[in-house]
Amino acid sequence: MLAKSPLKIVLCSPRGFCAGVVRAIDTVERALALYGAPVYVRHEIVHNKYVVDSLRAKGAIFVEELEEIPDTKAPVVFSAHGVPKSVPEHALSRNFFSIDATCPLVTKVHREAAIHFKRGREILLIGHSHHPEVVGTLGQLPAGAVTLIETAADAEAYQPKDPNNLAFVTQTTLSIDDTAGIVTVLRERFPNISGPHKEDICYATTNRQAAVKKVAPVVDAMIVVGAPNSSNSQRLREVAEREGCKVAVLVQRASDLDWSQFEGIKVLGLTAGASAPEVIVEEIMGAFAERFDLSVETVSAAEENEFFPVPRVLRPDAAE
């Protein structure tokens, strides 16, 4: 039997679930425990197939729009990404028992946008079109009240009605560096533009990207556990590439690994997006352990202790 080649795995810390994702998953599981199946969920509760399939097996039914739900007294949960105002209004018109699992840090962005609108400012939203979080934020205000800025070129081209009456907010899962570049353009062009008191890009996005920045330059390849439609996971892969990692791949499960990409490597970086469970990280490490003689090191960029309680209606004291 041939001896296994040595491989050092460098685990990024923090990685995986953030407080908003834990809250969203707990919301669906608590609703199932309290009210029984089915529990309807508009859109994937978080962007991870393993999580969605696990909840589906417990009795959650996932839909893209409320029109797909029959008249029911079952709970209807809104995903962590947030929804346009029209969605809860529609739910109310059908007498649905709706539960909002929007991440509190996304809700913070919604509130910021509403305050700017109330003050009569033109609002710019830095984000990626069609992402459900962006759709939800745009949908907090009347059509045309918010302009989407996706790139520094968009920021350069934007022509406001009043350059002294502008504000910006951002999607919570963006690239720190890309967003900083866009904000720099906006502040140079419009020195009086109002921004968030605290960065809209969330702590989890920031910390996970910081960990990848520390690890990517010292590894031969980087694996990011996450779904293709997960914005924060895709950003982690991009950060690894920018930091000089020649092989940076996004995978959902160990079965997705293309082993030809890892031939001859000596050091592998491993992280997970904010919606990816640790069990998949362990699964991937197990797959590498079958082929390599592993040693493991953890590199930390931050400590996390954030916690968001589930919506009030699901808390034990709700009936008191």
Curated annotation (Swiss-Prot):
InterPro entries: LytB/IspH. Binds 1 [4Fe-4S] cluster per subunit. The keyword Oxidoreductase applies. Pathway: Isoprenoid biosynthesis; dimethylallyl diphosphate biosynthesis; dimethylallyl diphosphate from (2E)-4-hydroxy-3-methylbutenyl diphosphate: step 1/1; Isoprenoid biosynthesis; isopentenyl diphosphate biosynthesis via DXP pathway; isopentenyl diphosphate from 1-deoxy-D-xylulose 5-phosphate: step 6/6. The active site is at E133. GO terms for biological process: dimethylallyl diphosphate biosynthetic process; isopentenyl diphosphate biosynthetic process, methylerythritol 4-phosphate pathway; terpenoid biosynthetic process. Pfam families: LYTB. It catalyses: isopentenyl diphosphate + 2 oxidized [2Fe-2S]-[ferredoxin] + H2O = (2E)-4-hydroxy-3-methylbut-2-enyl diphosphate + 2 reduced [2Fe-2S]-[ferredoxin] + 2 H(+); dimethylallyl diphosphate + 2 oxidized [2Fe-2S]-[ferredoxin] + H2O = (2E)-4-hydroxy-3-methylbut-2-enyl diphosphate + 2 reduced [2Fe-2S]-[ferredoxin] + 2 H(+). Isopentenyl diphosphate binds at H47, H81, H131, S230, S231, N232, S275. (2E)-4-hydroxy-3-methylbut-2-enyl diphosphate binds at H47, H81, H131, T172, S230, S231, N232, S275. GO terms for molecular function: 4 iron, 4 sulfur cluster binding; 4-hydroxy-3-methylbut-2-enyl diphosphate reductase activity; metal ion binding. Dimethylallyl diphosphate binds at H47, H81, H131, S230, S231, N232, S275. Keywords: 4Fe-4S, Iron, Iron-sulfur, Isoprene biosynthesis, Metal-binding, Oxidoreductase. Its EC number is 1.17.7.4. Transmembrane segments: none annotated. It comes from the Bacteria. The keyword Acetylation does not apply. [4Fe-4S] cluster binds at C18, C103, C202. NCBIfam families: ispH_lytB, PRK01045.1-4. HAMAP family: IspH (MF_00191). Catalyzes the conversion of 1-hydroxy-2-methyl-2-(E)-butenyl 4-diphosphate (HMBPP) into a mixture of isopentenyl diphosphate (IPP) and dimethylallyl diphosphate (DMAPP). Acts in the terminal step of the DOXP/MEP pathway for isoprenoid precursor biosynthesis. This is 4-hydroxy-3-methylbut-2-enyl diphosphate reductase 2. It comes from Rhodopseudomonas palustris (strain ATCC BAA-98 / CGA009). The lineage of its organism: Bacteria, Pseudomonadati, Pseudomonadota, Alphaproteobacteria, Hyphomicrobiales. The gene is ispH2.
